[in-house]
Amino acid sequence: MPLAMNLWSLTLLPGQQYPTYVRRDFQITNAALGEELRSKDGRSVVKVTHNPISQSMLESDDEWSDEDEDEEILSEEDDGEMEVEEVKQKKGKKAEKVEEEDSEEEDEDESDFEDELEETNVLCSLTAGKTEQASLNLTFVRGEVVVFEVTGDNVVHLMGNYIQQDEDSDDESDSDFDGEDDYSELYGSDDDLELDSEEEAAVAKITEIPDEPTPKTKKALPAADKKPVPEAKPAQKRKAEELESPAKEDAALSKAQKKKLAKKAKVEGEKAEEKPAAAAVAEKPATKKEAKAPQKKTLPSGLIIEDIKIGDGPVAKTGKRLGMRYIGKLTNGKQFDANTSGKPFSFVLGKGEVIRGWDEGLAGMAVGGERRLTIPAALAYGNQKIPGIPKNSTLKFDVKLVSIN
């Protein structure tokens, strides 16, 4: 049974055609008249021109890759049939030839486009005041090209969902599975994350930050303890010699003057010991500041946002297309979805293409940043039962923003 994902919609204006190349599997479930009716009793007929096209027909079989060109050139050089300059000239000519062939193929594809779309079918008929909406169950798979249109005077809205088709269990366990352009893209995730120990890696990144200055502090403390020992002793010894030297040179030096000199030597020795001790104390608050805990806040909706790493790139705003990496888990630690390699998941923020917890939790995030979102059921799938996600489940996502378009 297909798994319904984020929303799909299309608004049909009378008299216009809407060619659509299906990049992700989707299902149309409802057609309805618009809020404002141009014709109070007019009849609107929704039609689709449909003809599946295999993926192989959309891709060029004659494309030249750089590796193919290099292998051919190296082979010719080894045979001694071409000089270096001739190789370069041939490569340039082939590149021009490839561009011309690609251009001709594109023109042929465009010219054949109209001929390939042969079948036109009526999806439903809507009449204002009588039948203003109709339930549908139509599925369009990746690689198809369809054209939607409506006849009549009223606007019609088509609604549905992107879907995840059933796959083998082996494919589902692979992080880089075949449905990457549909289900994997829904949430998305950088290649530096791993499926089995993602949370531990994220925590390790945080704890390593305050641990870096710790060895410096430990090394500085013994050094501070050692410094006053050699400095204080020579100072005291020097002052003692100064006491003895005047005593030998000038026997008339009074006892009061000797005591004064001895006291001065003692004070200087204590100051020498206090300076490194104060430096060691000053290092401790600095270490505490560096070991700053991750920023965590709870929104009125119950969504908990924890900034693991603050990014330094562009900031995510409503209407921007984000590229994401992510790992989704239940509160018991069981992972139900992830995107950690391949093409990052791409979606437009704030347009309802993902669950509300993502639309709210990713706003204000900067490229390069990492967050942990704890999303209550009301902002996720609610009481819906989805494979791998029980009803009324609180979800946890470790997300990383990798791009903004």
Swiss-Prot record:
Task: Provide the primary localization.
Answer: nucleus
Give me the Gene Ontology terms describing cellular component: chromatin; nucleolus
Task: Identify the residues that the record assigns to the PPIase FKBP-type domain, covering every copy.
Answer: 319-405
Entry's EC annotation: 5.2.1.8
What is the catalytic activity of this protein?
Answer: [protein]-peptidylproline (omega=180) = [protein]-peptidylproline (omega=0)
- Basic and acidic residues composition-biased segments: 238-252, 265-276
Bilayer-spanning residue ranges = none
Subcellular location per UniProt equals: Nucleus
Inhibition and activation profile: Inhibited by both FK506 and rapamycin.
Which Pfam families does this UniProt record tie to the protein?
FKBP_C, NPL
* Highest rank taxon of the organism: Eukaryota
Q: Which UniProt keywords apply?
A: Chaperone, Isomerase, Nucleus, Rotamase
Looking up InterPro entries in the UniProt record yields: NPL (IPR041232), PPIase_dom_sf (IPR046357), PPIase_FKBP_dom (IPR001179), PPIase_Fpr3/Fpr4-like (IPR023566)
Compositional bias of kind Acidic residues: 59-84, 98-117, 165-201
Region annotation (Disordered) ranges: 49-117, 164-297
What molecular function does GO assign, one term?
peptidyl-prolyl cis-trans isomerase activity
Q: What class of enzyme is it?
A: isomerase
Which family does the UniProt entry place this protein in? Answer: Belongs to the FKBP-type PPIase family. FKBP3/4 subfamily.
Under the subunit heading, UniProt states: Binds to histones H3 and H4.
Q: What does this protein do?
A: PPIase that acts as a histone chaperone. Histone proline isomerase that increases the rate of cis-trans isomerization at prolines on the histone H3 N-terminal tail. Proline isomerization influences H3 methylation thereby regulating gene expression.
Protein name per the record: FK506-binding protein 4
Please name the source species: Cryptococcus neoformans var. neoformans serotype D (strain JEC21 / ATCC MYA-565)
